[in-house]
Amino acid sequence: MLYKGDTLYLDWLEDGIAELVFDAPGSVNKLDTATVASLGHALDVLEKQNDLKGLLLRSEKAAFIVGADITEFLSLFLVPEEQLSQWLHFANSVFNRLEDLPVPTISAVNGYALGGGCECVLATDYRLATPDLRIGLPETKLGIMPGFGGSVRLPRLLGADSALEIIAAGKDVGADQALKIGLVDGVVAAEKLRDGALAILRQAINGDLDWKAKRQPKLEPLKLSKIEATMSFTIAKGMVAQTAGKHYPAPITAVKTIEAAARLGREEALVLENKSFVPLAHTNEARALVGIFLNDQYVKAKAKKLTKDVETPKHAAVLGAGIMGGGIAYQSAWKGVPVVMKDISDKSLTLGMTEAAKLLNKQLERGKIDGLKLAGVISTIQPTLEYSGFDRVDVVVEAVVENPKVKKAVLAETEAKVRPDTVLASNTSTIPISELASVLQRPENFCGMHFFNPVHRMPLVEVIRGEKTSDKTIAKVVAWASKMGKTPIVVNDCPGFFVNRVLFPYFAGFSQLLRDGADFRKVDKVMEKQFGWPMGPAYLLDVVGIDTAHHAQAVMAAGFPQRMQKDYRDAIDALFDANRFGQKNGLGFWRYKEDSKGKPKKEEDAAVDSLLADVSQPKRDFSDEEIIARMMIPMVNEVVRCLEEGIIASPAEADMALVYGLGFPPFHGGAFRWLDTIGSAKYLDMAQQYQHLGPLYEVPAGLRDKARHNEAYYPQVEPARPVGALKTA
């Protein structure tokens, strides 16, 4: 053994060939600060070996290196800029030493090689991969850019266009694509990986492969003519501006850095990468996006722990076909859980099966599946007008019309047709679960399972615990949701549960703005372009359905009369009374026509202004800041109340529910991350300016208390002391 660290070791493999093996405690390898330092120590040893002829890098895990240790990021990003720059310089000196070894080097790459893992293998001369490879640089999705030489080596290895596509989009690619673009030199079966890598290394040692020529382009300026460079970088900047926009500075910073470094050799180019990385790491966007990643890991780990003692349902059923029922049935079948889909009409069953078939055909058109797979999946959805097959189902989700009487009747009837241990769930969006459970003989086997539309795209499922719901029931439903590829978040019962409960105060803020003379078009523009929502409130209401919102508004007002009962006729009432239900009938705040792809496209409709004039004061202008404050304060206050009342268990789960269920702008990180970024005291000052608008603007007691003590909702991290840094070790 030449060297043994906590996460890697170095040993002789055969005459003159050394093997550096990543083998961290636990299930995966991460390129954390300690591992970078350990890699440096291993290189200290290697550089002293006079008889060294070649080096092989490999992993003992199912994945090579999954990336940097993102749990370190928040504390690392608090390190002063100069010290962070010094540590990056140290880390890059390690990878440069790996690249500059006076012998050929090869990485045997299996599974994931992402972020720092990808940057590590870029420093070797050759890369041999297994068919399960996923390799790429996802840093821009975290609000940063590659910092270990990825923005320097990848363009010089692949060419500017392919590298820009991967780096700017934060993409990873599979083995076939990686081979096609030159990111790996070969693909072999997993059992042949080590021997195959050794064979390539021996060829390089023997002179059959020119490893020095292979290495040289990574050390030199990018080989692009002026015209080629202008075209590549102009197109890349245009694409990034269109897709990422101003709220996500990392992609455009990465492109501009690669452009500026194109005429430079490795050392000078790495200096530019360092100078670009450090300011990005100190942005609110980076902290928010890293926070989302960590929150997602937390939510998934919680679901895994919750379901460790239950068996994932093997057969499921959906009550109510239609678009929603068909979407749920498709998702279950697609992920390998056969499903019975029941309705009372052939027409609805046809609609549900058509929806499932449409989604499968899209997969076929994109080349994701073949005809055999399509037929196999669709055959696991059994449409029925009766309860045939319900004796074998483990879980049933009801997705009928949003009417408590209808839902109660359907649930009670179904309970009599299933096994005593079968779990029942309701896809209600607003009706309290304990109310629906009142008609059941086994309320402990019942909970809420709130999917979001469209089911196949929206990652969130709210799992709602009723008054009598058992832990086992929750665990089974969480297991099914996870199997369906969804992110389940458990919430406690109340009108609207969590997501809709906090959405309707936001809509109420919108209604009050319109009542006071705001133009809905400007409100939409500000909330989309300035705050970053994917849709403004008027557009969102049209998509949800004005009739649906009108009904839900009444349910929420009955549940929370003190805050959500309004004493005026609002824009939603006016549009509802005029039969303008949004996209579903082509008329809402906007008029809708189908585009060439058959999708609804919004257009101006002057008729809506006269309708809104009856429920609004004369038009007046509001500043962007005032619009954002009046829209967001009611939502944030309600989010905080849900935490204080135990409806949602943690800030992390609340923020993920908002991002995954409502499209809360990821660069803000969710309501609690946004609150922490503003500061509780500053938020309180802002909210107090609008208290005259009513109870929705009154800040909850717990938040007032935090403001007094200047406390945050997320645990505050201390600046890191990176291992191996020049002046901070």
Curated annotation (Swiss-Prot):
NAD(+) binds at residues 324, 343, 400-402, 407, 429, 453. Its EC number is 4.2.1.17, 5.1.2.3, 5.3.3.8, 1.1.1.35. It comes from the Bacteria. The keyword Magnesium does not apply. It holds the Pfam family ECH_1. Substrate binds at residues 296, 500, 660. InterPro entries: 3-OHacyl-CoA_DH_CS, 3-OHacyl-CoA_DH_NAD-bd, 3HC_DH_C, 6-PGluconate_DH-like_C_sf, ClpP/crotonase-like_dom_sf, Enoyl-CoA_hyd/isom_CS, Enoyl-CoA_hydra/iso, FA_oxidation_alpha_subunit. Residues 311-729 are annotated as: 3-hydroxyacyl-CoA dehydrogenase. One of its GO terms (cellular component) is fatty acid beta-oxidation multienzyme complex. The active site is at residue 450. The record marks 119, 139 as: Important for catalytic activity. It catalyses: a (3S)-3-hydroxyacyl-CoA + NAD(+) = a 3-oxoacyl-CoA + NADH + H(+); a (3S)-3-hydroxyacyl-CoA = a (2E)-enoyl-CoA + H2O; a 4-saturated-(3S)-3-hydroxyacyl-CoA = a (3E)-enoyl-CoA + H2O; (3S)-3-hydroxybutanoyl-CoA = (3R)-3-hydroxybutanoyl-CoA. Pathway: Lipid metabolism; fatty acid beta-oxidation. GO terms for biological process: fatty acid beta-oxidation. Involved in the aerobic and anaerobic degradation of long-chain fatty acids via beta-oxidation cycle. Catalyzes the formation of 3-oxoacyl-CoA from enoyl-CoA via L-3-hydroxyacyl-CoA. It can also use D-3-hydroxyacyl-CoA and cis-3-enoyl-CoA as substrate. Heterotetramer of two alpha chains (FadB) and two beta chains (FadA). NCBIfam families: FadB (TIGR02437), PRK11730.1 (NF008727). PANTHER family: TRIFUNCTIONAL ENZYME SUBUNIT ALPHA, TRIFUNCTIONAL ENZYME SUBUNIT ALPHA, MITOCHONDRIAL. In the N-terminal section; belongs to the enoyl-CoA hydratase/isomerase family. In the C-terminal section; belongs to the 3-hydroxyacyl-CoA dehydrogenase family. This is Fatty acid oxidation complex subunit alpha.
